[in-house]
């Protein structure tokens, strides 16, 4: 089974949204994936999904459960097939954390950055970008 770890700065908005969106898409399309999410930083460790991100998932009909933000570890790097980042900063941080990605597992969700709704407060655009990226990755991996 392919294992995907979505990555953003805090693991409370974009990466966790990508986790639940991808799980939902995979289930609806009969594709078996193991999906999780993590942060590059330690700032939000233990926190649940940011409430506006949770509301957006609920509005779009994406199932989710209680979440505990966590930071990515070397164990994650070794056990996941793909570490998919939301933006260039996430990619730089992961490359620094994981010795410049010797196994070539670090990718970006889209060719462009997914805007961080923590700063922009634009959860609709973030959701649409993440959904677009997850659909493209699901097609690529199916």
Residue positions per predicted region:
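Phosphate-binding/catalytic loops
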Residues: 82, 88-142
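Conserved active-site segments centered on acidic
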Residues: 1-78, 139-142
